[in-house]
Structure formats: C-alpha cells, structure tokens
Amino acid sequence: ISLNRSLSDYVSGGNLLEGQFTAEAIDILVQSPSFSGSRYCQNGTLVDGFIFLFPGTEVNALSIHESFWGHQYWMQWNGSTNNYRAYQSGGYSFNAYAFLAQKEDGKPSNINQMGIFAHEFSHVMGLSDLYGSDQNGNLVPGPTPWDVMTQGMYNSSGRKPPKYSGFERESMGWITLTEFSANEEIY
C-alpha cells in the first residue's frame, strides 16, 4: 500500500508521529479487497506481527527524523491508540511490528538487506537482542558474527545473516536442548 503523504508529513514539532503513520497504513490495508487478516492470526483476531517498509533508504529517512531507522515496536505504545492497547481496524487487532527502510543504504536501487529484516522481524516473533553496552556505553557485541540477534545481521553487508542459534531455537520452542553433565561422554 502507499500513503498519500510523504515521510516528512509525519514529523511535527520535532516529534515523529509514528503512531499516525502506522495507523493510517493499517486503515488503508484493511480496506483492500485482497486483505485477509485471518491468514495472519494464529488465534482469534490478533495479527501476530507485521512489517512497515518506509520508502527509500534509512539514511534519507534519518535526514527527516532521527527515529526513522529500522526497529521493532508495538502499536499500543507508539501513539496510535489512547488506551495502550493494540490498534483496532477492520475487525482485527495489530500490535507488534517491524519498521524498516525499503531500500539499501548506499545502493538505493537494491532492496534492503535480509540481515536487518531477519533481525527486526525476529523481535516481532519475540526474540531479544543479544548485544548490549557496558557501564561506559561501549558495545558488548555478544556472539557476533554467529548470531542474527547481534552483529551477525551485518554478515556479508547484511546479505547473509546466520541461522538462528540453539538458544534462539529453544526460546521459540522449535527445539529442546539437552544439558550435558561433566561426566557424560559426547560423541
């Protein structure tokens, strides 16, 4: 879908109006005859997760406002509602989403890197970052480059993110890890 306004129209008084941007996009989406929200709901009417691709590159969007960068967030907190609940439209509820640039920085003719998509959508699915910062604000990279939830999202300039780690697969309920004791032989 396309909105009828430019990104710069969603900035007012220095504030990003992300809630307005996302709500307007959802309202247009649910009116489309091709939209079938039930395809995206595991239970009931809550759409399990979705992605907003804003036009152009992240660098260009950041020149409009410092918050136009790839991230994951929730409709209940972004200003789209006044009651801190999921946004309602077309009989469906919308909450967790990723917000990404459509085009690649430095190569605007290319679609954005898969690594950033995989990282941010993994947040929508419930995974957390595996990097942080120390008390001085310095990056603590985590298991980079072997993990998409840390710096692995940038492998091969973001084109080849790693597979999910055992920790992430277990966190999602996809596998059960076996804990070994010190006296067990491992083959």
What is the predicted role of each segment?
Residues 49, 55-187:
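Extracellular hydrolytic enzyme modules, especially secreted metalloproteases
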